[in-house]
Every structure is written in C-alpha cells, then in structure tokens.
C-alpha cells in the first residue's frame, strides 16, 4: 500500500526544464487521437521529457544506472521506456484531474495508466515494470489556459518559452507516486470479474487496466527491487567467470 508520505517529489532546476524544452522542439509527431491545440501538444511532450529527466536523476542519486532509453510517440503524448538490469520499465506521466484537490486526492482515486491495446489480454501488456508520475497541475484548467496563449513554439529564445508556457510550474510539481510489476498486475486483473478489469474516460478511444495507485508499490521499494536484481545478476556473472576460469 502507498501512503501520501511514500510519494516522492522530484525537484528540477530551471536549466533542466529548459533542456527538456529544447528536446521537445526537436521532436515532431501527430496527435492522432484528438485535435488539440499546438501549445497543449507541446506541453504533453514536454512533461514526458521532464518525467524522464526527473526519474533518471532519482535513479542515479540512488546508485542505479539506466542502460538504455527508448521513445515511442503515442498519440498526444510520448511513452518513455528504460532498461535497467535487463528489465523494461515503462514510465507514464499525467496531469491530475481537475476534481482532485492535490496529489493526495490523486493517490486515493487514480490508477497507474496501463493501456489495454486492441482488446488484448493483460498477459500481452508490454513492460516488466510500470511507473507513474503525476504532476500537481490540473488537466482541463491547464489545457484551457495553454489554448489561449500565443506562443512561438519554434523560438530559439528558451527563456521566452520557459516563461510563455509557464514551464516553471514543473520545478516542484513532479511526483513519483507508485509502480507495479507485470506479474503482479496480471495476477490481480485475472482475479477480477471481467467487467471490472478495465476503465475508460468519457468519449475516449482507449481502455486502461484497473491498477489503483494506492494498492501498488511504494516508490522507494523500486530501488531495493533493482539493487537486489543487480546483486543477483552480479553474483551469477561472477560465478560464471569463476567457472570459466576453472574450466580453462
């Protein structure tokens, strides 16, 4: 179970956010789910890269190195996958629903966003580990504000973009809330009645697997998970080398 005290606030600097703005400018993909204002699309991509940078910093500060990163355009957002200790980690980043007062409200009501693709079974879910970041910023209110702004998204003036898009809001509103491993989610979903396994937004083209944040895993437990996995892999590798030397 995850409590509000377990949630980790991932702090970023202005320079780091500007780095993410620059990265967002360099990537273009189409919003194939709904026609959204360019500013909103830009912000969707931006928060994906901000989440990536924030999580990488957090892993490194805890002695965990990321082996590889992959980016997959996904409608109006971007999926970011990491490889750590041979495990595939999928990172999801979301703004909070407007009805949620704060990050505690998100914890009590929301899920890790696990997309059910093309009606597939939960066994087909990609990724070994699924992490969920929520930004303490309200979705509809932010989208409405962004849609009213006149911003040159291709400006070379990073300070202008940082201010015009209110990117400074990401300095302290990035929260790593929870994570879950695939084996656990498969067992949980299969234990539920079929009609209670998925949920969706009104008028949405997507389904999500039921995965409440509160009953998922605490952020800090992910560090222990990978350290144990790396230790086991290191022990196996050492034993393999020792055996190879013996056989020589």
Regions found by a protein language model. Name each.
Residues 88-91:
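A generic, well-ordered mixed alpha/beta core segment in the N-terminal half of proteins
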Residues 1-79, 93-248:
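Nucleic-acid endonuclease domains
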Residues 82-86:
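Active-site beta-strand termini and strand-to-loop segments that position acidic
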